[in-house]
Amino acid sequence: MKNDLIRPNVLSVKIISNVSPEMAKKLELEPHHKSLGLITADCDDVTYTALDEATKAAEVDVVYARSMYAGAGNASTKLAGEVIGILAGPSPAEVRSGLNATLDFIDSGVGFVSANEDDSICYYAQCVSRTGSYLSKTAGIREGEALAYLVAPPLEAMYALDAALKAADVEMCEFFAPPTETNFAGALLTGSQSACKAACDAFAEAVQSVASNPLGF
C-alpha cells in the first residue's frame, strides 16, 4: 500500500579474519586492513547507508560496494541479492563491530517507501544527519556533513530531484543518472540537516505525485 515501508533483508554475512595477500592487493587494501567483513542484501541503497554507519561505529573502511545488475528481483542466485559490501579493519573484532552496526541500521526501519497502492513504484529519501567516511567520500564533502540520499525509478527520480533542489537550500554533489545498475536514478544532496530533510520531503511528495498521475503533464 501507499507509504508502506519496503523492508530490506540481509542475505549473507561473513568475516575473513586474516585476508590473503593476493586478495588484499586486488582490493587495494591499506597495510592496516587485516580483516574483512562481507555482506549481501536485497536493497543496495539502504546497505550503502548502513555501511556508512559502520564507519562511524567501528575502526573500519568500506573498501568495496557494488550493486548487482537489474536489482534484487532479477538476482541470479539465492544469496546474491542486489548489493555486495566489504568492510576492512585491523582485526576481526573491529570488523564484527562494523558488521553489527550495518545490520542494526538495516533492521532499524529504514528502507524504500511505496508510492502507490500495489507497491510497484518505490523511492528512497533518507536524511543522513552526519555522514561517515564512506558517503562523505562518495559525495565529495567533509565527514560529518549532512546528506539527502534520494533514489527512485528513472522518470520519477528526475522529476523529484528538480523539486527537491527547488524546495531547499541544498546542492547536488553526486548524480546517479538513469539507468543505474538496478535501473533506478537519484542523487546525493548536501546542505544543513534541516535543508536535507526538506529536500527528502519534497522528493517523496514529487515521486508520489508522479505515481498518482503518470500521464498528466
Curated annotation (Swiss-Prot):
Family: Belongs to the EutL/PduB family.
Record: residues binding ethanolamine 1: D44, E82, F112, T182, N183, F184
Disulfides per UniProt: C127-C200
Residues annotated as binding cob(II)alamin: H32
Keyword annotations from UniProtKB, A to Z: Bacterial microcompartment, Cobalamin, Cobalt, Disulfide bond, Metal-binding
Site positions per UniProt: Important for gating: Y69, N74, N183
GO terms for cellular component: bacterial microcompartment
Residues noted as binding ethanolamine 2 in the record, renumbered to the chain: D45, F176, T180
InterPro entries noted in UniProt: BMC_CP, BMC_dom, CcmK-like_sf, EutL, EutL_PduB
UniProt subunit comment: Homotrimerizes to form a pseudohexamer.
Record comment regarding domains: Has 2 BMC domains which can evolve independently of each other. Two ethanolamine molecules bind in the interface between these 2 domains. Ethanolamine 1 binds on the cytoplasmic side, while ethanolamine 2 binds on the lumenal side of the BMC.
UniProt-annotated location(s): Bacterial microcompartment
SMART domains hit by this protein: BMC (SM00877)
Name of the featured protein: Bacterial microcompartment shell protein EutL
Major localisation: other
Cited function: A component of the bacterial microcompartment (BMC) shell dedicated to ethanolamine degradation. May be involved in cofactor diffusion across the BMC. Cobalamin is covalently bound to 1 subunit of the trimer on the concave (lumenal) face in a closed pore conformation; whether this is physiologically relevant is unclear. The closed form has 3 very narrow channels (1.3 Angstrom at their narrowest) per trimer lined by acidic and aromatic residues; 2 ethanolamine molecules can bind in each channel, on either side of the constriction.
Domain BMC circularly permuted: start-end pairs: 1-110, 111-217
Pfam families: BMC
PTM annotation: A disulfide bond is seen in native crystals; it disappears upon reduction with tris-(2-carboxyethyl) phosphine, which also reduces the protein's affinity for ethanolamine. It has been suggested to confer redox modulation to pore opening.
Source organism of the structure: Clostridium perfringens (strain 13 / Type A)
An example molecular function term from Gene Ontology annotations: cobalamin binding
Gene: eutL
